Amino acid sequence: MAEGVPASPSSGEGSRGPHSGVIQWLVDNFCICEECSVPRCLMYEIYVETCGQNTENQVNPATFGKLVRLVFPDLGTRRLGTRGSARYHYDGICIKKSSFFYAQYCYLIGEKRYHSGDAIAFEKSTNYNSIIQQEATCEDHSPMKTDPVGSPLSEFRRCPFLEQEQAKKYSCNMMAFLADEYCNYCRDILRNVEDLLTSFWKSLQQDTVMLMSLPDVCQLFKCYDVQLYKGIEDVLLHDFLEDVSIQYLKSVQLFSKKFKLWLLNALEGVPALLQISKLKEVTLFVKRLRRKTYLSNMAKTMRMVLKSKRRVSVLKSDLQAIINQGTLATSKKALASDRSGADELENNPEMKCLRNLISLLGTSTDLRVFLSCLSSHLQAFVFQTSRSKEEFTKLAASFQLRWNLLLTAVSKAMTLCHRDSFGSWHLFHLLLLEYMIHILQSCLEEEEEEEDMGTVKEMLPDDPTLGQPDQALFHSLNSSLSQACASPSMEPLGVMPTHMGQGRYPVGVSNMVLRILGFLVDTAMGNKLIQVLLEDETTESAVKLSLPMGQEALITLKDGQQFVIQISDVPQSSEDIYFRENNANV
């Protein structure tokens, strides 16, 4: 990528204005270069990451584009890329090789697969000088490698310019070492999430998978999935009003999509009913996170509007003028069509809610106050007045429709008469709409979860002890087992080997059924375990055991019978299971 003519603002006034820092940033990092192009959104993304958490002086994309035109007055625009993934590019500029952001730019070019004739690969390394020196040798290499499953490591990117800035303040070697260690730590977490999903589902035996595919079992595990996904949500984005970076929100969305992809790949080959059940829950999980990240992004922008007293004052006065001047008369008929009698527009719950929200403008900069006001109106006019799920759905749909009509009428009036505050209103409008959808949708999802829990409880038997394992009667002996087996009275009576390819195994004890559930490996000790389900058909009780290979476990039944389970570790996929019955008391 050849560097060209250095950039300079076309006007001296611009460099001394309120955006002088942005202009100087453009001059320091970009230059004029024919036959080169820079993606517009990528250029702005690097600028946003440079600002970090200091968003007070950060400019929006439209202002940033105007400043780019100010610094590069003869700049062209091109739309490059394949159909469906084309991006607008600034044509005629390039990033300087001396820029702190050069390595990061090259990496992002490869990661996002932007079209650029001079794009080079960026190796994930903290040696930034070697990155530039290896430019020629990296041209024919892919910037990242992904496996068919979609490894999360390809989406985990470094921030070399920030690392370089920290290296200038502190020890360079220590900073490079610490950055490498921490990034490896983050990658290990992502890798382990995928490995946990894959290892669990791929280790299940066929009869276990068939058991999990039964409708009532699917319903039971659905309750566990709900808890799992809610726990992940609390960790990733507990409150969407938290002030988090845009990059973090992108990472949350990316993780949820990757999680769904990993699960689908792990479920390949399992019965369709089980796949559908798991797909439904993980899809709801992705949608909830998408709603939260979208709300968080809008809340971040709206928070900047509320901090500007001038913009809030103009917005409030314009909204009051629209309502007081009767500009919303066109929506009266639509809003009052569902009312019995001659209810006035001003007495509608939607108008009351809007008036209360307008009155809060200028009195508080806390976004929670506005959203709490909307929530209280929903609680009063929808939640408290509904006595059934069907009635709630009807009231919620009616309120949402009328609310949308009202806000759309306000937007129309803003467009025609109050252009100065239209941008602020548009943000406020979108936030209110999306927040209402989030509340109503979350309520419906919680209602469905409660119904699922009720279905699971209905499937439980009337006798609370029925089907519950008696841990006192079913126990395994570890240290004392060798001593007990050494006793002369504990000679085994018989051995019955069986092949583990079947789902049910005769065990040499009447009315006893042994099922193989799967295999586990103790990574800490290196021991291999086998999970079995032992069922007593007479007492209708069962217990799940994790038995070590090559050792014995003593089982005592309710009727006093005792037998030892011994599992021998044999090659390939077969196991010899020996059951030795002993009626002696131990």
From Swiss-Prot:
Keywords: DNA-binding, Nucleus, Transcription, Transcription regulation. GO terms for cellular component: chromatin; nucleus. InterPro entries: DNA-bd_RFX, RFX-like, WH-like_DNA-bd_sf, WH_DNA-bd_sf. Residues 22-97 bind DNA. Gene3D superfamilies: Winged helix-like DNA-binding domain superfamily/Winged helix DNA-binding domain. It is found in: Nucleus. It comes from the Eukaryota. SUPFAM superfamilies: Winged helix' DNA-binding domain. Its main location: nucleus. The keyword DNA-binding applies. GO terms for biological process: regulation of transcription by RNA polymerase II. One of its GO terms (molecular function) is RNA polymerase II cis-regulatory region sequence-specific DNA binding. PANTHER family: DNA-BINDING PROTEIN RFX8, RFX TRANSCRIPTION FACTOR FAMILY. Belongs to the RFX family. May be a transcription factor. This is DNA-binding protein RFX8. The lineage of its organism: Eukaryota, Metazoa, Chordata, Craniata, Vertebrata. The gene is RFX8.
